[in-house]
């Protein structure tokens, strides 16, 4: 045999035959329909942060169309805790997907990677084999496991490798798009331009990629900081006298008024519009001024030389300015009752569109939480964040005639701006999470009736039963699964990402953006809280990386906190996160009552809450034992 023939025979014998691929293939066709290309994809994101999802399919439902339109006009970047998806031509083998709860690796068939740090984000995955109202057949949907929050303003990639198998048991083939130098239009070019980021991160492993999308997560920090600093500069002062309403054994109650800037456009209650207006620098633009009332509880005891420490209360939906002072019809039985004996004053206001601030003067808070107008819901929350900035500025210069509280022993009662605290409850915890992130004056905070994940809010919440409300609002059929993997719900959650508590939590200690010094935070959970179920609370606790006071009542809390390197800690504890104290306390709900309210109705919870702030006022916040007094 001639030498050339021998060489050809040797080459043929030594080269392995190509491995067969599955008939199921990933679909990446940017010239097709909406779900024929992966999402998020950089070609849908505009330079101003708005998102073009105008071709999102589904029935002509008013709320769905409003979500599509508002993301196109008022969106602020892709979500960090929202869903991603990729369609396939046929069914896959679900057993080839990564297991939930197992730490991700680059050997997984599907993973989400931070292309700037190379960190992997744990995922929750679902393959939707059947068509539903808002999703096609054979759609693979991934969400970050709620509580693992991808970094803000950072390039990420959702990657499917050839370790994913089709229903025939064979590996899915590589999408031709990954090796094409051109074609597919502007959106295809936008993704193609970012693929080198993934190639660099994966190196030789890039050859095993079957499909991928590369995108930059949104960042709410810059806008939050602009809102806070602009509102902080508003000239804040009490309008007229601060008058005494009544006295209780431990404190006196006062009421006053102040003006606040309103940044939302349009007419209240914002059934239309309601979006904040921003200038070219990103600062909010004042549309008008509104006069609101505040309530103030002043301890009936000697005032410290620097003034009383002051807690700012952010009430739940419908709560009045007196929510920290009274408990329903029980005057003087609010949390001010346990703060005042420890020398801590308290102040509160109503939310916008609540009580006398609502059109007609008697709002119960429903229109604040306006799901029918998603951008107004988002910016109602941000408007309240701005108002607490104004209130904090007011409080630094606020004085009360000392003769009104003789026990204070001062001619003029003042408040110590170096010892300001925040407590947000329920809806107020969403606002409070942002306030904690944005204002350096606040040195410690408590969030009660609190949790994370707008996706969970839309599908898990029992009070109100959100999944049952979502169905008619979005025109679901009985065959539809109302879960976190439904793409239309990601549109809603993306709109609300700037007020997502899980996004705020890293900014309390670990990822300081809108503030420069860390803060101590206490999460208070009742089990079961039907407004924020344990998985929702755990998601927030994970994102904040708190420790739970031992023994934990919810075993899943221990398991899930372990994923982020925290867990049970014996009380008392403090300074467990650098110099800050980050804790979660859990209590059983009282009989026939919802765990949502344990901070108000369990005596031992009230004391533990008060001790947290009393110790913060002394220099270091401490999570004390439930059955112990203050240190």
Regions from the language model: what does each represent?
Residues 1-7:
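Sec-dependent signal peptide recognition
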Residues 268-291, 303-411:
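Cap/lid segment of the alpha/beta-hydrolase catalytic domain
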Residues 20-269:
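Acidic, low-complexity Ser/Thr/Gly/Pro-rich repeat segments typical of extracellular/periplasmic
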Residues 97-101, 122-125, 153-156, 167-178, ...:
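Short, solvent-exposed loop/turn and secondary-structure capping segments
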Residues 394, 400-461:
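Primarily recognizes the serine-hydrolase "nucleophile elbow" in alpha/beta-hydrolase
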Residues 14-16:
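Bacterial signal peptide processing site
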Residues 135-162, 166-167, 287-332:
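A conserved hydrophobic secondary-structure block that centers on an alpha-helix together
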Residues 141, 376, 380-383, 443-631:
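C-terminal subdomain of alpha/beta-hydrolase-fold enzymes, centered on the catalytic histidine
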């Amino acid at each position: 045999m001639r030498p050339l023939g021998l060489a050809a025979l040797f080459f043929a014998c030594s080269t392995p035959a190509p491995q067969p691929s599955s008939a199921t293939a990933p679909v990446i066709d940017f010239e097709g329909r909406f779900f024929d290309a992966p999402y998020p994809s950089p070609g849908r994101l505009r330079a101003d942060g708005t998102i073009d999802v105008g071709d999102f399919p589904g029935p002509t439902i008013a709320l769905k169309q409003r979500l599509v339109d508002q993301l196109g006009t008022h969106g602020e970047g892709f979500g960090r805790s929202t869903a991603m998806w990729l369609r396939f031509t046929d069914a896959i083998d679900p057993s080839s997907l990564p297991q939930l709860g197992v730490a991700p690796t680059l050997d997984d068939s599907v993973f989400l990677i931070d292309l700037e740090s190379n960190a992997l984000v744990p995922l929750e995955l679902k393959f939707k084999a059947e068509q539903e109202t808002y999703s096609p057949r054979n759609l693979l949907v991934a969400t970050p496991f709620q509580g693992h929050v991808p970094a803000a303003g950072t390039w990420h990639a959702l990657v499917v490798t050839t370790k994913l198998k089709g229903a025939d048991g064979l590996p899915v083939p590589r999408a031709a798009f990954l090796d094409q130098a051109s074609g597919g239009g502007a959106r295809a070019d936008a993704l193609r331009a970012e693929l080198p980021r993934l190639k660099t991160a994966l190196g030789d492993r890039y050859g095993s990629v079957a499909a991928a999308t590369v995108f930059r997560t949104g960042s709410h920090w810059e806008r939050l900081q602009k809102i806070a600093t602009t509102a902080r500069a508003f000239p804040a002062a009490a309008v007229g006298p601060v008058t005494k309403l009544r006295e209780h054994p431990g404190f006196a109650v006062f009421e006053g008024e102040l003006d606040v800037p309103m940044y939302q456009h349009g007419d209240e209650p914002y059934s239309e519009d309601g979006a904040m207006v921003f200038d070219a620098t990103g600062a909010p633009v004042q549309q008008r001024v509104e006069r609101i009332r505040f309530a103030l509880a002043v301890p009936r005891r000697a005032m410290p030389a620097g003034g009383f420490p002051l807690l700012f209360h952010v009430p739940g939906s419908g709560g009045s300015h007196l929510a920290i002072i009274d408990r329903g019809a029980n005057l003087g039985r609010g949390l001010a009752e346990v703060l005042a004996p420890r020398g801590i004053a308290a102040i509160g206001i109503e939310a916008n569109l609540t009580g006398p601030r609502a059109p007609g003067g008697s709002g119960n808070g429903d229109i604040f939480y306006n799901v029918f107008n998603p951008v107004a819901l988002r910016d109602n929350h941000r408007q309240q964040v701005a108002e607490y900035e104004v209130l904090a500025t007011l409080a630094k210069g606020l004085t009360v005639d000392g003769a009104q509280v003789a026990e204070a022993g001062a001619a003029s009662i003042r408040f110590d701006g170096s010892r300001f605290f925040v407590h947000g409850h329920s809806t107020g915890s969403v606002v409070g999470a942002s306030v904690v992130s944005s204002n350096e004056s606040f040195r410690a905070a408590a969030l009660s009736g609190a949790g994370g994940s707008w996706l969970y809010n839309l599908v898990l919440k029992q009070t109100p039963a959100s999944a049952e409300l979502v169905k008619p609002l979005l025109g679901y059929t009985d065959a539809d699964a109302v879960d976190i993997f439904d793409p239309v719900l990601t549109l809603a959650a993306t709109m609300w990402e700037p007020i997502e508590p899980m996004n705020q939590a890293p900014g309390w200690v670990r990822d300081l953006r809108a503030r420069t010094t860390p803060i101590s935070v206490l999460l208070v959970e009742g089990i079961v809280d039907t407004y924020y179920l344990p998985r929702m609370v755990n998601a927030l606790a994970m994102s904040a990386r708190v420790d739970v006071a031992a023994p934990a009542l919810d075993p899943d809390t221990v398991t899930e906190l372990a994923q982020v390197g925290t867990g049970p800690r014996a009380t008392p504890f403090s300074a467990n996160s650098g110099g800050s104290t980050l804790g979660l306390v859990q209590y059983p709900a009282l009989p026939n009552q919802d765990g949502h309210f344990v901070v108000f109705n369990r005596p031992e919870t009230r004391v533990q809450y008060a001790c947290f702030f009393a110790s913060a006022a002394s220099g270091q916040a401490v999570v004390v034992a439930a059955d112990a007094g203050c240190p």
